[in-house]
Each structure stands twice: as structure tokens, then as C-alpha cells.
Amino acid sequence: MARVLLVEPFHGGSHGAWADGLVVHSRHELVVVSHPAAAWRWRMRGGALTLAEEARRAVAEHGPPDVVVVSGMVDLAGWLGLTRRFLGDPPVVLYLHENQLLYPVSPNQKGSASDELPLVNWMGMAVADQVWCNSAFQRDGLLAALPDLLDRAPDHSHVGFLGEVADRCYVVPVGVDLADVPISKGMVPEEMVPADPAGPLVLWNQRWDHDKNPKAVLDALRHLAAEGVAFRVALVGENERVDPREFVEARDHLGDRVVAWGFQDRAAYVDLLNRSDVVVSAAHHEFFGIAVVEAMAAGCVPVLPTGQSYPELVGSWADGALYPDGDLRTRLHDVLIDLDGWRARVVGLDEAIRRFDWRTVIADYDDRLETLAAGTDRDITSGTTGGPD
């Protein structure tokens, strides 16, 4: 059993769920240092110093780690410099839930995007022994975007280092806590409960942020309501916005069709997963998709865009799960008026998606950590750790 120091600069939401799940399910001894889920830009710019101090106290109490795993919302290069006197030289993994090269800029963000935070990501990748990305979509997009970033350097370009860093990049999906998510009946129409006369229950369960493109979903729902299509809707998920105006307007417009709204505690959320028929997304950005995985595991028929990480999630069920660009309203309409037919197109997806259950993926995490702790898969200078998975 290895001792693993887990550094989570943004302990909340999907980041916090990942860190907590790893601690609960791993066979290794995990020691966690973290900061709350707030001020993410400051975490990336300045969190290294205070996280290094927390790491110093953790090492003094628990002993030096065999492996260090650092979540990506911090300056890893700076953090390693600040911890060099007490940390020793354990292998270091950078885990990327997202990256700032590909993350869409908020329309409310002041000023133009700069290279500062993307370079924090790059320097972290350069100093890590291994880089774990939560999806092939993120890994491949990141590696494709890096040359353009690095080519903008005025001199001493880093482009020559890209190949060896790419060789240390692996796909290691996040685990999802599905133990309490009900196992559906295989989405076989004749086995499902009778249809609700008010129509299928449509679930929106993502963050209420610009990158999830809620406006497209809410507009589609309003149009379908105006056409007289029968449906109910649950508009739930994390919301840190002071004025989620489009959601408030949608709630007022849809009226009694809205059966749940806003953040739900775990018990209420799981109950909602059990009652929902359809999960919908129009996300501009999705490097993995925990909320959608939860809904599909519970038997929801997915109505998802063709891009992002979604093809990777649904695999051979793509024709029944993904809609072409611009066809959200049409696909959602078709699913709502023929729910049983669309259920039949995705039979088996609910079982296949459970490959992301923590109880399944933890073996891969633990084996990777054990190999690193043993020192048999580490060579930061030559990039000989093997190619991407």
C-alpha cells in the first residue's frame, strides 16, 4: 500500500467529488490537502504557496508520500518549488479535470483572454511525471492546442519539449458515485412503468454556467411547450450566479411543467434521477460529463450534442443518443412524442455507462499509483513512460 498525497486546490463540485471518491475507494493511504471551491483564478495564480504550507504540515504528521497527485487548478511548477525542502522526490501526477487552453471564455469576463493561465497548465504538464486527463477528448484537444500557444513565445520556444510531454499524457476517467443511483430496467419499453399523462420528465442537471449553454435548452423547451408537446421538466444543478435570469424566466414561462428547480440535496437528486425519462444537454464545453453519466446510468434517454466528450461516453449508441448541430429542438421533440421508440435505440447504454462507477475504475487508479510508487513507470527526462492509452 502506497502513501499518496492528494492536492485538490478547488475542493467542491466535480473536483471535490473526485477527490472524495478517490479517498473512499482507493486501497492506498491518501492524505488530502485542499482549499475551498472558490476564486479559481486565484487558486491557479496564488494557491501554490498556501497549499505548500498545508502540504508541509501533512508531511510532518503523516510522513513523506510515495506518490503525489495534484489536481490541475494550481501552479504545479511553483508548488513543487515551494515543497522541495520537505517533500523529497516522489513521482508527481497532474490530474486535469479541465484546461485553460480549451475552456470557453465567459461573455461576462472583463478584458481579453491571455496566455497566463494556459501557461500555468503547460508548465504543470512539463514538470509532472505523468499527466492524467479525464477523457480522450480533453487530452487530444489539449495536445492539438499546445503548439499554437507555445509558438507565441518571443524566444526560447518550448515546442521542442511537446513530444516528450505528450508521451506522459494518459486518459484516466473520473470515477462517478453510482452506488445509490437506481439501476434501470434496461430501458426496454414493455418493462417500463406506465407513462405519466403530463408527459415525460426532462432533466437538466448541469452547472448553471455559460459553458453549458442553458439558453439553447431553455429556448427549446419554451418552443415545445408553445407547440403543445406534453412534458415536465426538472431544472436542477449547481448555481453560484446571483442572477440566473434565463432560468427564472423559463420557470415563470413553463409554470406547472417545472417539477424541480435549483440545487437538490443528494437524496432528492437521486430520487429525481429515478423519476426522469430524458436528460438533455447543449453544452459548448464538456471534458467528461458526470451529471449526464449519472442520468444515463439511471436509465434516462440522452439528448446530447455530437461534439465534446459525449461520443466517447455513449460509444456505439451514438445514433440514438447524439443529435447533429442545430437539431436540439427537433431531436427533443422526437424523443418526447416517441419515448419508447427512443428508449429502444439506447437499450444497454445504462449498463455500459456504469463502467465509470468508482467501484470499477478504482482498480485502474490503484494499479497506476502502485506502479508509480514502485518506481517502475517514471522517466521525466526521456518520455519513456509509454504512449497515451
Regions found by a protein language model. Name each.
Residues V176, E190-K212, L218-H223, V233-A234:
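Conserved donor-binding/catalytic core segment of Leloir-type glycosyltransferases
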Residues H284:
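Aromatic "clamp/platform" in nucleotide-sugar-dependent glycosyltransferases that forms part
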Residues D271-S276:
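Short alpha-helical donor nucleotide-sugar binding micro-motif in glycosyltransferases
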Residues V301-P305:
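Short hydrophobic beta-strand element within catalytic cores of glycosyltransferases
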Residues D129-M187:
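Donor nucleotide-sugar binding/catalytic pocket of nucleotide-sugar-dependent glycosyltransferases
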Residues R245-A267:
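Nucleotide-activated donor-binding/catalytic signature segment of Leloir-type glycosyltransferases, i.e.
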Residues W42-G46, G326-D327, D340-T376:
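A charged, aromatic-enriched C-terminal amphipathic alpha-helix characteristic of glycosyltransferases
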